[in-house]
UniProtKB/Swiss-Prot annotation:
TM region positions: 1-23, 35-56, 117-135
UniProt keyword terms in alphabetical order: Angiogenesis, Congenital disorder of glycosylation, Developmental protein, Differentiation, Disease variant, Endoplasmic reticulum, Glycoprotein, Intellectual disability, Lipid metabolism, Magnesium, Membrane, Metal-binding, Receptor, Transferase, Transmembrane, Transmembrane helix
Effect of residue 230 to A: Disrupts NUS1-DHDDS heterodimerization
Protein name (database record): Dehydrodolichyl diphosphate synthase complex subunit NUS1
Species: Homo sapiens
BP GO annotations: angiogenesis; cell differentiation; cholesterol homeostasis; dolichol biosynthetic process; dolichyl diphosphate biosynthetic process; positive regulation of blood vessel endothelial cell proliferation involved in sprouting angiogenesis; positive regulation of cell migration involved in sprouting angiogenesis; protein glycosylation
Phylogenetic classification of the source organism: Eukaryota, Metazoa, Chordata, Craniata, Vertebrata
């Protein structure tokens, strides 16, 4: 009887994987699926499979060897591999993809969710975005930078099945590790309102030094000169900002660097889904950026 239960479970698991693969393929091909319909399908699948899962689950036997638990881990690895393939295909399906994305939290009445922001960062990594800036005007994420990094690494392992210890990390554009976190193949910078102001102050100081050294004249200060001083750290300006919350403002997020940035507003970052995230990417890919013209 146990063998029959296991066979039924394997068949249902295979059907579920096939359903997800077909859904991903159709969404990439047509791009018009309603994400609410997907949520309903997932909820229905969970409702159907949950009782069976409880039926098939066996109580752990005392002294049983750990090798009997390899099947769930194998299933997790398969799911992670499926996620990687699906999300990478999503990124390649877009006409254009932001190189640098900003995540700006403007919600003031709710505590920010580290797990939801970590999910967004991992999704960015999966679709191929290279730089992420995480910002909240209260500086909560920056004060708890280590906690955010731990959550990102945890989500990376769970969603993508990647072990960050296998990669050689490099911190983006700073010598201060306390100001930044790094995810494999993705530079993540955690910012607060002081960072944007500090960048402008440093750029002004650098220009004054150039004038004092007679390498520049005071009249040489213009938009292009200031832009070059601010971008000298090697990180490109944000191409896209996802602003979460009802406030119609970025609340001091890199004021100079977002002159030409596309901004997409979302109601909240809490419980955000991958479909919401990818919908914002599709909106960015479809927009025509005039670059100030």
């Amino acid at each position: 009887m146990t063998g029959l239960y296991e066979l039924v479970w394997r068949v249902l698991h295979a059907l579920l994987c096939l359903h997800r693969t077909l859904t991903s393929w159709l969404r990439v091909r047509f791009g018009t699926w309603n994400w609410i319909w997907r949520r309903c399908c997932r909820a229905a699948s969970a409702a159907v499979l949950a009782p069976l899962g409880f039926t098939l689950r066996k109580p752990p036997a005392v002294g049983r060897n750990r090798r009997h638990h390899r099947h769930p881990r194998g299933g997790s690895c398969l799911a992670a591999a499926h996620h990687r393939m699906r999300w990478r295909a999503d990124g390649r399906s877009l006409e254009k993809l932001p190189v640098h994305m900003g995540l700006v939290i403007t919600e003031v009445e709710q505590e920010p969710s580290f797990s939801d922001i970590a999910s967004l960062v991992v999704w960015c990594m999966a679709v191929g975005i290279s730089y992420i800036s995480v910002y909240d005007h209260q500086g909560i994420f920056k004060r708890n930078n280590s906690r955010l990094m731990d959550e990102i690494l945890k989500q990376q392992q769970e969603l993508l099945g990647l072990d960050c210890s296998k990669y050689s990390p490099e911190f983006a554009n700073s010598n201060d590790k306390d100001d930044q976190v790094l995810n494999c193949h993705l530079a993540v910078k955690v910012l607060s309102p002081e960072d944007g102001k500090a960048d402008i102050v440093r750029a002004a100081q650098d220009f004054c030094q150039l004038v004092a050294q007679k390498q520049k004249r005071p009249t040489d200060l213009d938009v292009d000169t200031l832009a070059s001083l601010l971008s000298s750290n090697g990180c490109p300006d944000p191409d896209l900002v996802l602003k979460f919350g009802p406030v119609d403002s970025t609340l001091g997020f890199l004021p100079w660097h977002i002159r030409l940035t596309e901004i997409v507003s979302l109601p909240s970052h809490l419980n955000i889904s991958y479909e919401d995230f990818f919908s914002a990417l599709r909106q960015y890919a479809a927009c025509e950026q005039r670059l100030g013209k």
